[in-house]
């Protein structure tokens, strides 16, 4: 079945005249801010070289830390760090980047540190972070977190 397909230059010319807003301006309060990170491979061997000669020991990775509005799926802020920076170390920087009011912040157990909870309390944000496995109780000022410890 022969199908015609426009080439890149034709698509590029036509795209100039399309008036679609790519970013919707959002304002106001963020109900739930979801925070997580992922690893990115910056550079490495090509597939052929790895298959032919084997893998080298050193790899170059970076970590992308993201904060996303759960309601609109908009990326509120992002931070790129070296692979040796932990999620909890990058967390305060992500929270400080946003200047909008946040009601609650969700994150995984890796963010269950006093540094993260202190930053959320400073900005009056409710923490929705599960305690780590075999977590102990913290001082009384972390009462909300202590209620989740089983």
Describe the residue ranges of each PLM region.
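Active-site- or DNA-interface-adjacent structural scaffold in DNA-acting proteins
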Residues: 1-56, 68-72, 121-129
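A general structural motif
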Residues: 30, 63, 100-102, 124
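A short secondary-structure junction signal
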Residues: 44-47, 76-80, 89-93, 116-118, ...
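Short, flexible loop/turn motifs enriched in small residues
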Residues: 57-63
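Active-site beta-loop-alpha junctions of metal-dependent nucleic acid enzymes
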Residues: 58, 78-100, 104
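A short, conserved beta-strand element enriched in hydrophobic/aromatic residues
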Residues: 65-83
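Short, conserved beta-strand edge motifs with alternating hydrophobic and charged residues
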Residues: 67, 78-79, 104-108, 128-131
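Helix-centered, glycine/charged polyanion-binding patches within enzymatic domains
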Residues: 109-150
């Amino acid at each position: 079945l022969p199908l015609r397909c426009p080439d890149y230059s034709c698509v590029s010319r036509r795209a100039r005249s399309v008036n679609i807003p790519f970013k919707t301006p959002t304002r106001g309060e963020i109900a739930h801010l979801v925070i997580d990170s992922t690893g990115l491979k910056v550079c490495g061997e090509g597939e052929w070289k790895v298959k032919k000669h084997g893998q080298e020991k050193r790899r170059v990775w970076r970590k992308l830390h993201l904060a996303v509005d759960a309601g609109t799926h908009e990326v509120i802020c992002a931070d790129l760090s070296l692979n040796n920076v932990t999620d909890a170390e990058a967390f305060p920087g992500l929270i400080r980047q946003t200047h909008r009011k946040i009601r609650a912040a969700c994150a995984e157990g890796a963010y269950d540190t006093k540094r993260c909870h202190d930053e959320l309390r400073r900005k009056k944000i409710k923490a929705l972070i599960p305690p780590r496995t075999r977590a102990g109780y913290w001082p009384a000022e972390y009462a909300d977190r202590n209620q989740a410890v089983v």
